Regions:
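N-terminal beta-strand motif that seeds the catalytic metal site of vicinal oxygen chelate
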Residues: 1-18, 73-78, 126-128
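Short, charged/polar surface micro-motifs in flexible loops or helix N-caps
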Residues: 48-52, 59-61, 83-85
Length: 128
């Protein structure tokens, strides 16, 4: 049997590293961390005690190929504090959001996409 410890990181394909770094670093406010000197461009960010790795594949597109927000599509989830505060922050930066404050789960959800169409769910323990 495999004995899993924890999720270590999530890797996402991006097409424009500067644009992705602006979104993840400036808009979402994730702290960028040191990255080994790989032979391809990318960036690493801290997500609490986990990591997000952005990887550039020149000349290709990301998996989805669209920026439409679809909660049923592949996505990763980040738990945040303050539903309204998070929503206000995203909207003040012009980020399109799909709100699900009340749903079948026990946590309020906000879905967004990054500039390449990767879906991100931000959820909170409870509605403010």
């Amino acid at each position: 049997m495999i004995e899993f410890e924890t999720l270590h990181h999530v890797s996402l394909s991006v097409t424009d590293l500067d644009r992705a770094k602006h979104f993840y670093g400036e808009v979402l406010g994730l702290p960028e961390t040191a990255r080994p000197a790989f032979d391809f461009p990318g960036a690493w960010y801290s997500l609490g005690d986990r990591q997000l790795h952005l990887i550039v594949h020149p000349g290709t597109r990301t998996l989805r190929g669209t920026r439409a927000i679809d909660a049923r599509d592949a996505h990763f989830v980040v738990r945040v504090r303050g539903y309204r505060q998070t929503l206000d922050h995203l909207q003040s930066h012009g980020v399109a959001c799909r709100e699900r404050p009340r749903n079948l789960t026990s946590w309020p959800q906000i879905f967004v996409t990054d500039p390449d169409g990767n879906v991100i769910e931000l959820n909170t323990q409870s509605l403010d």
